[in-house]
Amino acid sequence: MIGLPTGTSIWIATGFTDLRRGFTGLSGMVQTTLQENPFSGHVFVFRGRRGDLIKMLWWDGDGLCLFAKRLERGRFIWPQATSGTVSLTPAQLSMLLEGIDWRRPVRTQTPQLAV
């Protein structure tokens, strides 16, 4: 994951999105549906209908960046809400991108000694 500047907000667009959209389509969706400015420096995350593909739109100060990730197995954990946005922390975004349930992360125990 590319390091985000301190103070960058991460917004998940709830529901599903037609991910055939590119820079222009997703920017328009941020403005009309989410009522946000796509050039604000915040990260906007969208999920496709099947749940195995997400796209992230981010203005880095020089231009718009569009990132995509498809899971080979499983689906991305997504909020149950059908409209609006959900805010994530950078740690939650990292878990989302790894396919981990970011809503209830579970720490695995590492053995201290192999006796």
Each language-model region and where it sits:
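Polybasic/polar functional segments that serve as interface/processing modules
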Residues: 1-115
